Design a protein with these regions (language model features):
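Anionic-ligand binding patches
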Residues: 2-6, 13-218
Length: 218
């Protein structure tokens, strides 16, 4: 019988992305919150993406008893200081006390980019894994102060949306390659296509290794 691992998000684009990190694990079956009918809300009160990923993974494990993978991210603009209220940080969807849907995010961030952009942006991620016993581990390598990370994974956020949309990741429609000025959707390879480098290769390998080692109990 396959081991079931729950993807701890309802974001359809993030589900596909997180599944890709588990693709090399043998004998598993990934399931979603929708598959299980789980609607339990999660209070994201962590101070970092890594802490929020841990909170999510543990909450969904407690609700289901399953092994879980969790993820959270923050969005950061170089144009704003870390204490500037316009700096999204962990609150990408939460603006002025409201939680924005995809259309609301497009409207808000396109206005922000029109007023101050194009904005030099970067996502920073944290990952977490919980097994069936409740054992938990986290991983984060991203840092907005890491010049190699920002130069590798940074992008431009612009004020004019691309015609294409991706449910769950609406800001992809505002995102451009800073080296070519192309929208992500117009690049060969799609979302945030980057030049292959030792840094980017090692980053992906480290995330894969984190999940593989954890679920194989190494």
């Amino acid at each position: 019988m396959a081991r079931r691992i729950l993807i701890g998000t309802t974001n359809p684009s993030k589900i596909v992305w997180l599944k890709s990190y588990l693709a090399d694990l043998p004998g598993i079956e990934t399931v979603t919150l929708t598959d299980l009918g789980v609607t339990a809300p999660v209070s994201e009160e962590g101070r970092t993406p890594e802490e929020n990923a841990r909170i999510k993974a543990l909450s969904y494990h407690q609700a289901t008893g399953l092994a879980v993978v969790g993820h959270d991210s923050g969005l950061y603009f170089q144009e704003f200081s870390m204490d500037d209220p316009r700096q999204p940080g962990l609150f990408i969807r939460r603006v002025n006390g409201q939680t924005l849907d995809d259309d609301g995010m497009l409207a808000y961030y396109s206005r922000l980019a029109q007023d101050f952009g194009p904005l030099h942006a970067c996502y920073c991620s944290g990952f977490a894994a919980v097994d069936e016993t409740g054992r938990v581990a986290t991983f984060a390598q991203d840092s907005v102060s890491d010049k190699d990370y920002f130069s590798t994974f940074g992008f431009l956020m612009v004020g004019k949306p691309h015609r294409m949309r991706r449910p769950g990741w609406p800001l992809d429609s505002l995102s451009q390659n800073p080296k070519t000025g192309e929208y992500w959707y117009d690049q060969e390879g799609g979302r945030n296509t980057i030049e292959e480098s030792d840094y980017s290769r090692n980053y992906r390998q480290n995330v894969n290794r984190f999940f593989t080692n954890f679920f194989q109990n190494k």
